[in-house]
UniProtKB/Swiss-Prot annotation:
Monomer. This is Translation initiation factor IF-3. Keywords: Cytoplasm, Initiation factor, Protein biosynthesis. PANTHER family: TRANSLATION INITIATION FACTOR IF-3, TRANSLATION INITIATION FACTOR IF-3, MITOCHONDRIAL. PROSITE patterns: IF3. Belongs to the IF-3 family. IF-3 binds to the 30S ribosomal subunit and shifts the equilibrium between 70S ribosomes and their 50S and 30S subunits in favor of the free subunits, thus enhancing the availability of 30S subunits on which protein synthesis initiation begins. GO terms for cellular component: cytosol; membrane. The gene is infC. Its main location: cytoplasm. It comes from Synechococcus sp. (strain CC9902). NCBIfam families: infC. It is found in: Cytoplasm. The lineage of its organism: Bacteria, Bacillati, Cyanobacteriota, Cyanophyceae, Synechococcales. One of its GO terms (molecular function) is translation initiation factor activity.
Amino acid sequence: MAPRPRFDRRAPVRELPNINDRISYPQLRVVDSDGSQLGVISREEALEVSKERELDLVLVSEKADPPVCRIMDYGKFKFEQEKKAKEAKKKSHQTEVKEVKMRYKIDSHDYDVRIGQAQRFLKAGDKVKCTVIFRGREIQHTALAEVLLRRMAKDLEEKAEIQQSPKREGRNMIMFLTPRKTPLLKKDDKDSSVHQAIRTIPAPPRSTAAKVAAPQA
C-alpha cells in the first residue's frame, strides 16, 4: 500500500519586499523622496543616496527597463498601504440585517448574551433586528415585550439608534437598530455644551442713561 501523502502544516513563506540590498539589478531609474528624478544610476549609487537620506530604496516597477526604484520610508509606506486596504474593505462591507431573538421572560444571563451579540453585529456595521417571540397566550403580554425592547435600545444607545420602534409583526414584536453615526452626547457633555453656549452669548449693551453721571448739587 502506497504511503499517504503528508501535508505540510508549516506557515507559507511570505515573499520579502524588494528593498535596499535585496534589489539585484545593476542599473536603476531612481525617483527621489520628493518626487524628483535622479535618472538612471547604478545600484550602489542608489543605495548610497538612500542611506544618506536615512530612507529605503524600494523597487516599484520591476518590468520597466531599467527597473524603477523610489527612495522612501518603507515602514511608513507599508503602514499607509495597510490602512488604505482596511478602509477599502470597510467601505466594501455590505450592510446586513442580523437578528437577535428572545422571549419576553428572558433571564439576566441570556439577556446579557443577546446584548453581546447585538454589540458585535453593530460593530461590524450591520443593522440588528430585535425580536421578541410569543408562544400561545404570551401574546397577551405585548406591553412587557415593548418594555424589554426599549430597555435593550437604552443599553445599546452608545452604539446604536432606533431605526424602527417596537411594533407587532404577526406573533412577534420587533424593533430595528442601526449603528450610531454620531457619538452619543452624555448628560455631562450636554451640560458643558449649554454652559459654553451661555458664556458665548454677548452681554446686553449698557443703557446711555447709566453712562451719564448724575449732576452734582
